[in-house]
């Protein structure tokens, strides 16, 4: 396995570990989630380039679209929670239920 794949997998695992450790604040969870999506995007792009299959180029673009949607929803929740409560704790997400 080339060293670049191991580095990207290590970046994904570090982001996953950060997501598990720093799960009390929404901002740190969003940053770890973005790190995971970035490493998945780079890995899928490298795989698509190595496969030389024309339809494989759609996968990184679709992943990038989902990452952008996830970031928009996450930032909207962050702004909503911080405007309402002044804090970005994840346990405040339960208070947004009707």
UniProtKB/Swiss-Prot annotation:
GO BP, one annotated term: ATP synthesis coupled electron transport
Q: InterPro entries, alphabetically?
A: NADH_UbQ_OxRdtase_chain4L/K (IPR001133), NUOK/Mnh_C1-like (IPR039428)
Q: This chain belongs to which protein, by name?
A: NADH-ubiquinone oxidoreductase chain 4L
Ordered alphabetically, the record's keywords are: Electron transport, Membrane, Mitochondrion, Mitochondrion inner membrane, NAD, Respiratory chain, Translocase, Transmembrane, Transmembrane helix, Transport, Ubiquinone
Please give the organism.
Trachypithecus poliocephalus
Which EC number(s) are documented for this chain? 7.1.1.2
Gene for this chain: MT-ND4L
Q: How does it assemble?
A: Core subunit of respiratory chain NADH dehydrogenase (Complex I) which is composed of 45 different subunits.
Instruction: Please name the GO terms that the record assigns under molecular function.
Output: NADH dehydrogenase (ubiquinone) activity
Topology in membrane: Multi-pass membrane protein
Q: Give me the segments passing through the membrane.
A: 1-21, 29-49, 58-78
- Quote the catalytic activity from the record: a ubiquinone + NADH + 5 H(+)(in) = a ubiquinol + NAD(+) + 4 H(+)(out)
């Amino acid at each position: 396995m080339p060293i670049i794949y191991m580095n990207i997998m290590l970046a994904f695992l570090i982001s996953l570990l950060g997501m598990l450790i720093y799960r009390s604040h929404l901002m740190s969870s969003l940053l770890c989630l973005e790190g995971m999506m970035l490493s998945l995007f780079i890995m899928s792009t490298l795989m698509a380039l190595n496969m030389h299959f024309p339809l494989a180029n759609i996968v990184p673009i679709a992943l990038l679209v989902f990452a952008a949607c996830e970031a928009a929803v996450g930032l909207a929740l962050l702004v909503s929670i911080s405007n309402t409560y002044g804090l970005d704790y994840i346990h405040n997400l339960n208070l947004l239920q009707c």
